[in-house]
Structures are given as C-alpha cells and as structure tokens.
C-alpha cells in the first residue's frame, strides 16, 4: 500500500464518531466519514476551532456550516497548487490520498526518456492530469 505522506498543506488530525478533522492549508474542516466507526473522545482542540463543518442529513446529502472560512483558497502539494472550495456534497475538490499515485506516475513520466502522452479518462478533480503535465507529459 502506498501512503500519501508528502503533504505539507493537508493532514488528517483526528477522527471519531463518524467524522474526521482535517487541516487543508490553514483551515480546519470536519467532514463525515463512514469508515470512522470508533467512539473515542474528541479531545483535539481543532474540534472546537474548526472553520467548516459538514452536517450529514438523515434524508441524504447535508450542508456546510462555516466559521471564518473563505469561499475558496489554495493549497500546495510539492510544485502543484490547487484551488479548494467546499461543495454541497461534502467534498473540497481534491482527494489528497491520490498524491501517492501522482508521485508514482510522475516519476515514471520523468524517467521515461521519451515524450509521454496522457489521456486521463478518470479526471474527476483534475489533480492527476495536473500532476502528469507538471511531470512533463502532454495531456
């Protein structure tokens, strides 16, 4: 398994009771995560100082509650810059765990010794396409 551990602008700080506390740049967001099944105390101070909290609705979907959070902001991963924005379905426009894949294929592209063309048919956020282009691929 590859772990996306080269982030400086993103981290999962804590998780409990079906939610995770994440740092996206200088902003703290709380979002639901169905894989967080443990019920540990939320003692991390970020739980009380969050900038955004996505509340899941019992009917499906949900809504954000904001506390001093801009409409959008940027974070960096190595030489890549991403614009983030909370969407109505809990996402921010980026999946940081995919950085391990960006590193892997970026290395393959740089070491190929030939022109590389990439057609990303799974370009949900554009992160992989941006990483491939930065590594030298024609996208």
Model regions and ranges:
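N-terminal accessory targeting/assembly segments
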Residues: 1-4
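Conserved SAM/SAH cofactor-binding pocket of Class I
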Residues: 106-139
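Single, functionally critical "micro-switch" positions that shape active/binding sites
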Residues: 24-25, 121
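Non-catalytic substrate-recognition/targeting regions of SAM-dependent transferases
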Residues: 6-23, 29-96, 103-106
């Amino acid at each position: 398994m590859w772990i996306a551990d080269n982030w400086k602008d993103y981290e999962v700080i804590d998780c409990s009771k079906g939610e995770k506390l994440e740092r996206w740049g200088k902003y703290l967001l709380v979002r639901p995560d169905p894989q967080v099944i443990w019920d540990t105390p939320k003692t991390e101070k970020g739980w009380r100082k969050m900038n955004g909290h996505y509340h899941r609705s019992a009917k499906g979907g949900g809504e954000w509650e904001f506390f001093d959070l801009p409409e959008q902001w940027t974070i960096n991963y190595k030489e890549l810059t991403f614009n983030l924005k909370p969407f109505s379905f809990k996402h921010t426009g980026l999946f940081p765990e995919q950085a391990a894949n960006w590193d892997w294929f970026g290395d393959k592209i740089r070491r190929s010794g030939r022109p590389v063309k990439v057609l990303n048919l799974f370009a949900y956020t554009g992160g992989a396409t941006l990483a491939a282009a930065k590594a030298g691929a024609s996208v």
